[in-house]
Amino acid sequence: MNTTRSQAIFSAAQRLMPGGVSSPVRAFRSVGGQPIVFDRVKGAYAWDVDGNRFIDYIGSWGPAICGHAHPEVIVALQDALEKGTSFGAPCELENQLAEMVIDAVPSVEMVRFVNSGTEACMSVLRLMRAFTGRDKLIKFEGCYHGHADMFLVKAGSGVATLGLPDSPGVPRSTTSNTLTAPYNDLEAVKELFAENPDAISGVILEPVVGNAGFITPEPGFLEGLRELTREHGALLVFDEVMSGFRISYGGAQARFGVTPDLTTMGKVIGGGLPVGAYGGRAEIMEMVAPAGPMYQAGTLSGNPLAMTAGIKTLELLKQEGTYERLESTTERLIKGILEAAKAAEVPITGNSIGAMFGFFLCEGPVRNFEDAKATDTELFGKLHRAMLERGIYLAPSAFEAGFTSLAHSEADIETTLKAFRESFAAVA
């Protein structure tokens, strides 16, 4: 596979931007080799600057659930573009998307739009503390909630009740209020509440983990968190930036029947444009300025182009049979991946829900981030490169979920599984 232009462009980028990228995982540091520089995307495919075509299972890290550059989304954006790129003032499109989100997501009675998932999580953290009058929060090892200081706590070091900064520049005093527990471990959460009476504002988690690889909640875990937070007067927050509108139209909370107090969203609700949102019970959301005293603002929040793309995307997702089709596609994919690995005698465990999937190159089960770290990252790097050579674009990290879309055809899945069979055989 010729990647001459990608290599030249990335070489130049390294002189212009830290690491040559605008987000670290794109640099391929954890899988080796040079990153691919893309030229265009359409449907289930991405083309690089050298003309190579890939079947894409990243989908812009989640937003492209209808497929890249869906024709109806593009037409809607072209029409909206004629009216301007940004208003910096209220627009009716905000109302339309807000109504759609409120109708879909069980916990959301009011919503505030922002510009990214990180911004949504930063804002909801402030809101948790403002509403409860408490400073501490509980997060789970391996769960990612953006790069705000208080969320950058070292993961995978056991039940670290006093978080240590996971990045230079983050003061210990900032992360000292962040308590961590292993995912799927209710007893650890109970202990944190017992050790910090009347001090914990809430619990935030990815209800389905996608940033430590793909890890699903065990039966009773989400329900247990709901009971514990109510018992201790704390808030339960679902970070559905990744799972929202992807594992069901109402997200993980609709799928599992557990309603949090607050929810953060992003990715899918912007249809591929920068967006984030947070919402929840009206009595909590009414604390947000200008209705209440908790300040949060944004120059480009409620951007008409992002609202337009989000509205059209959700309209497409509401069509009959959408999620059944996504589920079937993803189940077929992960089943074939597991079979391919086992045929090559490669240890593997994996799973899927809705249009999310993931696998670890180790014996299962994987219940939390500590378990996930047993995956063979060196072997994954070899597998990633082998798949790339065969025209399949997987996330360049052993600790990221994969995504399918409505654009992935049966032929795409079969081509992908053929590549997995060949690649596992080559790297085993």
Swiss-Prot record:
HAMAP family: HemL_aminotrans_3. The modification N6-(pyridoxal phosphate)lysine is found at residue 267. One of its GO terms (cellular component) is cytoplasm. InterPro entries: 4pyrrol_synth_GluAld_NH2Trfase, Aminotrans_3, Aminotrans_3_PPA_site, PyrdxlP-dep_Trfase, PyrdxlP-dep_Trfase_major, PyrdxlP-dep_Trfase_small. Its EC number is 5.4.3.8. It is found in: Cytoplasm. Its cofactor is pyridoxal 5'-phosphate. One of its GO terms (molecular function) is pyridoxal phosphate binding. It catalyses: (S)-4-amino-5-oxopentanoate = 5-aminolevulinate. Belongs to the class-III pyridoxal-phosphate-dependent aminotransferase family. HemL subfamily. This is Glutamate-1-semialdehyde 2,1-aminomutase. Pathway: Porphyrin-containing compound metabolism; protoporphyrin-IX biosynthesis; 5-aminolevulinate from L-glutamyl-tRNA(Glu): step 2/2; Porphyrin-containing compound metabolism; chlorophyll biosynthesis. Keywords: Chlorophyll biosynthesis, Cytoplasm, Isomerase, Porphyrin biosynthesis, Pyridoxal phosphate. Homodimer. One of its GO terms (biological process) is protoporphyrinogen IX biosynthetic process.
